[in-house]
Structures are given as C-alpha cells and as structure tokens.
C-alpha cells in the first residue's frame, strides 16, 4: 500500500487538527475541524483573524501539528505528526475551498471566518494496527 494513500485514507476519516505556530519565540496551539484534500495534501480550516493563532500566523507561517484518535488501547493507536505552512486564502481559491468545506460541515455555512490552507510538507503516520510502533513517512 502506498504511504501517502494510506495516510490520506486515515486523514479523510478524521476531522480535528491541532497545529502550533511560533512568533518571536512565543508558541501557541489551536484546534479546528478540517477538510482534507488528498490531491493537494492540505487541510482547509476556518478561523477568525482576531484569534491569537491567526494573529501570530499573519498571512503565512511555518507550523507543526497533529491529528490523532482517542483509542483506549495502545494496539489501536493511530496518529499523524506533520510540519508545513499555513496561509490565509483569498479570492477564487478561498471560494472553492469554502464550498468544499461547507459540503463536509454544513453548519459552517453560518460562519464568516476566513478560509486557511495548511499545506503538509512532511508527515509521520504512526499506525499500531500494522504492528507496534509502525511508522509511515511521507515528504513533499
């Protein structure tokens, strides 16, 4: 099974991403519902510009983050660690991403928050269902 295909299949079944941003030595993390685009290897999220993490990100920033489930047993642990870049989308790019996001999360139609893209440049997927400590690694 191809590494990116396996990772993408799992990410498509999840819906919450955690990412951390750094600015002038200060770190901050945030969570959001996401839409995963397997073709672009990117998450799309909504977050207000006034939030601390958006203020620290500015229009574009390097980030790191995770997506994980909450299994009750070690043998079922699966999760992704990643590094990449977050940027606020504008214009047609934003409109297309928002339409796709709203299809996944219809309640988001009521939100006016800007759309952001988290482009994944490196992914490490831990999947204990394939054997304890099994890691799949992908890089752009």
UniProtKB/Swiss-Prot annotation:
It comes from the Bacteria. InterPro entries: Split_barrel_FMN-bd, UPF0306. NCBIfam families: PRK03467.1 (NF002900). HAMAP family: UPF0306. Belongs to the UPF0306 family. This is UPF0306 protein YhbP.
């Amino acid at each position: 099974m191809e590494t990116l295909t396996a990772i993408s299949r799992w990410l498509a079944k999840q819906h919450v991403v955690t990412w951390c941003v750094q600015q002038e030595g200060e770190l901050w993390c945030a969570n959001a519902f996401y839409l995963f685009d397997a073709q672009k290897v990117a998450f799309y999220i909504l977050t207000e510009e006034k939030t601390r993490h958006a203020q620290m990100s500015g229009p574009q920033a390097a980030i790191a983050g995770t997506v994980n489930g909450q299994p009750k047993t070690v043998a079922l642990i699966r999760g992704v660690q990643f590094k990449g870049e977050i940027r606020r989308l504008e214009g047609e790019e934003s409109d297309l991403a928002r339409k796709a996001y709203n299809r996944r999360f219809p309640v988001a139609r009521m939100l006016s928050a800007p759309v952001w893209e988290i482009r994944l440049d490196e992914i490490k997927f831990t999947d204990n269902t394939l054997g304890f400590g099994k890691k799949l690694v992908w890089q752009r």
